[in-house]
Amino acid sequence: MELFYELLLTAAASLLVAFLLARLLASAATASDPRRRAPDHAAVIAEEEAVVVEEERIIEVDEVEVKSARARECVVSEGWVEVGRASSAEGKLECLPEEEEAPAKAARELVLDAVLEEREEEGQVGEERCDLAAAVAEVVGVKPHELGVEAAPGEVSDVTLEEGKVQDVGVEQHDLVAEAAPREALDTGLEKQGVPIIEAVEIKRQDDLGAEVAPSDVPEVEFEQQGVRIIEAIDVNQHHRVALAAPAEVVDAGLEERVQAIEAGSSGLTSETVPEEVLDELSEKQEEQVIEEKEHQLAAATAPVAIPGVALAETEELKEEQSSEKAVNVHEEVQSKDEAKCKLHLVDQQEGSASKVELVGRNTDNVEISHGSSSGDKMIAELTEEELTLQGVPADETQTDMEFGEWEGIERTEIEKRFGVAAAFASSDAGMAALSKLDSDVQLQLQGLLKVAIDGPCYDSTQPLTLRPSSRAKWAAWQKLGNMYPETAMERYMNLLSEAIPGWMGDNISGTKEHEAGDDAVGSVLTMTSNTINQHDSQGNEDNTGMYEGHLTSSPNPEKGQSSDIPAE
C-alpha cells in the first residue's frame, strides 16, 4: 500500500510540474510574438471616440434634413385656396389639419398637402393633376342632377400645383346671390381678427331644395393644425357684394330679434324668482315657529322630570334601608334559633338547679350560700333575683328554666357541679387572662372538651367556610374527640385546666366546697355560659369576649395551621 501511495504522489507531482512548464512556455511565446501582444487601450479609446463623433454628425445631418422638410411643408401650406359655391349648392366643405404622413380621408375630407407629398415622392405629380382636380371637384363641386332647382354648375377654374409646394385652387361660380352675404361677413371677421389659422367654410343644406338658404345658416369655421400654418380665404367677386347686402341686414335683424327674445326670457325668469324668495321667507318663518314650539315642549317635559328623579332616589334609599333591616332581622333570627338549640341541650343539666332557685325565690327573697374556706371560716352571700339578672340571665328565662327543672326534678351530679365552677372561672376576667397565656394547642383542646361537655359530640355540625380558619380549627378540635360522653369531657376538661393553671380553684373563690344551695348558683352560671357561647358562635366573631374567646386570645400555632375559634352548631 505504501508503494501505491508513493506512485500516486509521484504522478501528481509530475502533472503539476508539466502544467507549470506549459504556462511558462505559453507566456514566453506571447511575449516574443508582436501580433499576440495585448492591445493598446489608448488606441481603442480613440477609435470609440471617433465612432461617437461620426454618429453625432449623422444625427445632426438628419435633424437638418427634417427641419428643411418641415420648412418646405410650411411653404406649401401657405398657398391660397379659392372656393366658390352656387346659391343652391349643397354639401359640406371641410379643410382638416394636415398631419405628418396622414392618409387622405374618404368622402368629403381631403388633405391636399398629404396627397401632394405622396405624389411628389412617387414622381407622379405632373401626371395626375387631373385626378387631384377631380377630387377637389368631388368635395367642393356641385352636382346638378342631385338638386331640384336649376343652378349653375360649379366650375373649378384654376387648380395649380407648384413644385415649390404652393397650391392655388380657384373655383369660380356665377350664382352666388344667396351665399354672398354670409361669406362677406366671414371675410370681414377674418380680416379684423388677423388670426393666422382661418377655418374653412361649412354650409348646411336644407331638406327643401326649392327654398332659399336661411340667413341663420351662418358658415361655421374650423381649422386644426399642428405646427403648420394653413391660410385659406374666400375670394368673392366685388360686383356681387352690392346685391347681397340685403340678406346681411336680414341676418342682423334676426339676431336682434333673438337677443330681444333672450332678454325677455331673462326678465321673465327674474319675475318668476320673486315668489321663490317669498316662499323661502315663509318656510324660514314656519321653521322658526316649529323650533320654538319644540323648545317649549322640551322645557315642559324636563320640568317634571326632576321630581321623579328625587322620588326615585328616595325609593332607592328606602329599599336599601329595608334590605339592611331584613339582613339584621335574619341575623337576629339565626341567633335566637341557636340560643334555643343550646337551651334544649342544657335543659337536663339546668333543671335541678333551676327548680331549687325557683323554690328559694318564692319562699324567701334571699338565697343564702355558704362557702367553706381552707381556714374553716364561713361567709354568707345573698343573691337576689336582681343580681342574677345583672349577671346576664333575664328574669323570664330564669323562671322558665326553673319551671322546667321543677317539672323534671333531675339532680346534678358532683362532676357537673365541679365543671360548673371550672366554667365560671374560665368565663371570668382572671380566667380569660390566664387562658390567653397558654399554648394554642392547649387552648384548642380545652375548646373541644368544653364543646363536647356542653353540646355533646360533633355528629351533624356543619363545617365552617374556608375563609374562616379559626372557626375551622375549633371545629376540627371538636370533631377530633369523636363520640366522647359529656361527663368524660367534663372530667378531662377539669384535669387539663388543673395542669395548665394549677391554682385556678383558689383564685376563683376562697374554697372548693359548695353549700347545698350552691348548686343553684352553679346552674345559673352554666346557663349564662351557654347563652354567651352560642351568641358569639352564631355571629361568627373570632375575638369577642366570652368563654370561647377567653380561651383563645393568643395567636394560633403556625406549624399546625390552627386558630382559636370553634363554630357554633
Swiss-Prot record:
Pfam families xrefs: ACBP
Residue sites binding an acyl-CoA per the record: 474, 493
Keywords: Endoplasmic reticulum, Glycoprotein, Lipid-binding, Signal
InterPro entries the record matches: Acyl-CoA-binding_protein, Acyl-CoA-binding_sf, FERM/acyl-CoA-bd_prot_sf
GO CC annotation terms, alphabetical: endoplasmic reticulum
GO molecular function, one term: fatty-acyl-CoA binding
Source organism, top-level taxon: Eukaryota
Protein name: Acyl-CoA-binding domain-containing protein 5
Organism (species): Oryza sativa subsp. japonica
Source taxonomy: Eukaryota, Viridiplantae, Streptophyta, Embryophyta, Tracheophyta
Gene it is expressed from: ACBP5
